[in-house]
Amino acid sequence: WIMGHMVNSIAQIDEFVKLGANSTETDVSFDKQANPEYTYHGTPCDCGRDCLHWENFNDFPKGLRKATTPGDSKYREKLILVVFDLKTGSLYDNQAYDAGTKLAKNLLEHYWNNGNNGGRAYIVLSIPNLNHYKLIEGFKETLKKEGHEDLLEKVGHDFSGNDDIPDVEKAYKKAGVTGHVWQSDGITNCLLRGLSRVKLAVANRDSGNEFINKVYYWTVDKRSTTRDSLDAGVDGIMTNYPDVIADVLNEAAYKKKFRVATYDDNPWETFKP
């Protein structure tokens, strides 16, 4: 999965897919009542990027829906996975459940079109704080109440705070999550970070006793870091330059071992070579 980083305006969806992304990441900010408000990152952000692209949250999922609904003029077949980077740092811990409820209602209406030929992409809810695990409960229970439990087949999870892997596992146990787990690791491209925790996550994924199904590393903009990430065995790479990742995947050393994921590849299944 080549994951386009910080895709916060509708126009950027196309821009990143054209560069080779089959997945995008979008920042979601919340208002004081725990409603998703904007797709917005703000300053500071990654080096070399404009941090200020944004949409109202109600509008972004509609644009995303068009890009991921077969038959729509804006449809982009390659775009199969979307990570919502939920900026819950502005919320109190006790608002996490409400945030999940409100996010579910919003996506149900504006992205899934109330279950009537909505967008087809898989969605990862990425939460920065383990204490906000109730967001997952709020999201799931809302879709069930609204009669759309089937859509949970399209929803996965990530805790993005670079916490110790056993602590992440505990948070999932509290939330009742038993699958559909992506594990991120990384840091802004302005700083360096080694791959030691990525390797621990990959080891869990491949242990046969795993709670992690997929591992992705962010933010990777250089060919050398891309090669190191692939050598470590990641499933996804989040990047500001999807074309760089696509180029490296075409190198002789990687061409036979890796390919770009398609819609038929289940993002919740651990890959077994």
Curated annotation (Swiss-Prot):
It is an enzyme of class 4 (lyase). Expressed by the venom gland. InterPro entries: PLC-like_Pdiesterase_TIM-brl. Mg(2+) binds at E25, D27, D85. GO terms for biological process: killing of cells of another organism; lipid catabolic process. Its EC number is 4.6.1.-. Disulfide bonds join C45-C51, C47-C190. It comes from the Eukaryota. GO terms for cellular component: extracellular region. Its cofactor is Mg(2+). One of its GO terms (molecular function) is phosphoric diester hydrolase activity. Coiled coil: none annotated. Dermonecrotic toxins cleave the phosphodiester linkage between the phosphate and headgroup of certain phospholipids (sphingolipid and lysolipid substrates), forming an alcohol (often choline) and a cyclic phosphate. This toxin acts on sphingomyelin (SM). It may also act on ceramide phosphoethanolamine (CPE), lysophosphatidylcholine (LPC) and lysophosphatidylethanolamine (LPE), but not on lysophosphatidylserine (LPS), and lysophosphatidylglycerol (LPG). It acts by transphosphatidylation, releasing exclusively cyclic phosphate products as second products. This is Dermonecrotic toxin LruSicTox-alphaIC1a. It comes from Loxosceles rufescens (Mediterranean recluse spider).
